[in-house]
Amino acid sequence: MSFLQKIGAWEHLDTDRAQEYQEMQVWDGETDSRITFDWSADSSPFENLPTVATMTENANLVRGLLSRIAASGDENVSIFSNTTVSSIENGTDHPDGPDLSAWPVLSLAPTGAAQSQPPTRITARLLVGADGINSPVRRFADIATEGWDYNRHGVVATLSLADPDQVAFPIGTRTAYQRFLRSLGGPVALLPLPNNHATLVWSTTVENAAYLKSLSPKAFIAMVNAAFRLPMTDLKYMMRMERPATSASDYEDSHESELTWRLQHTPPASHVPPMVNGVQEGSVASFPLRFRHASTYISPRVALVGDAAHVIHPLAGQGLNLGMGDVASLSKTIEYAVDHGMDIGDILSLERYTAERWAVNAKIGGVCDMVHKLYNVPGQGPVAWGRSLGLEIIDRLPFVKGFLMKNAEG
């Protein structure tokens, strides 16, 4: 958020669609070991807790950035909507003109009713690839990546929550929740949005993801509520429930009634989110979970940022933050080059950027990968005991939690 404020974009976002939260509850679904991330150790008990992080929708962020560009009135900025890059290739050395043989040349083509006709070709002094995991810019620059697929999918949805109990959920405090469900393939997380809404990110096996997406809204809601409240044995049973051969309403009732019955026979769970009571139509989707890291973020006249440079497991929610950190660092690198009369596309100018960001992103991605693997070790032996002990120890060491949160903030 600090970078968005610095560049003047935050004031263009709809702040009614941004939600701060003051703590994050993380616990093991098999041992119930728990850690609470907040700034209580650094604040007065008579004050509201400081913000841990801020959530907003991607659409709100994009609109805010476009609004900031429009408000700048900079005639040197051109935005081409409904336009695709059909190819990227090196330019040519003109005998009577500049040598552009090392400059990227982009061929553009309209994809629909564009507001203005884009140029057919653009020659770039510096081409920034912010074009995702399958980055064409990265392929053009012949930059290799290393990594692997997790054979897991992240199921996402926008949910509505019941009004929180003001005793269990104090006024002025919003909480994010994450429960590790090893037997189901990964953690489930609920991140707060304004007006009693939340974003779901449930990392699970490919089969479980397909099952969840096939459910009716009522059955899906029942499964999400179960994921934060039921013991693992009960949750695994509900994940295997078959569709009955009768009507869809019976199918919906079977999950709801199963959850109701099992909650009646389960000790009440503490520090769980409010009950989910709705799911936004069309919001349930999934995406494959992967780890990727480019061997470098730069080549002559090319720089990579965000998912084009690195993709990590979403369990720490750091994907966008890392990308924003890349953009902030690259901006400073370009500014330094301009101030010192350097060529912004020269590899020597860009080395400052890759030196600042590559190791940071590798460290955070590696930690997320290690935690994912640690919570997917089968059995109840020493590894499970070590996980629980580690959570409990860290929860009792405020300076360690503070260090982890500051690193997560970037």
Q: Where are the regions that the model predicts?
A:
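Short gly/ser/thr-rich secondary-structure transition/capping motifs
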Residues: S283-R292
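Short FAD-binding loop at a beta-strand-to-alpha-helix junction that anchors the flavin cofactor
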Residues: S295-L315
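Conserved N-terminal helical subregion
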Residues: D16-F140, E146-T158
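A conserved FAD-binding loop/helix module that cradles the flavin
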Residues: H313-G325
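Active-site flanking residues adjacent to catalytic metal/cofactor-binding acidic residues
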Residues: A130, G306, G325
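C-terminal helical "tail/cap" subdomain of flavin- and related membrane-associated enzymes
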Residues: K332-G410
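Conserved N-terminal glycine-rich FAD pyrophosphate-binding loop of Rossmann-like flavoproteins
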Residues: M1-Q5
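Conserved FAD-binding catalytic core of PHBH/FMO-like flavoproteins
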Residues: G112-A113, Q117, L126-P267, Q280-V284, ...
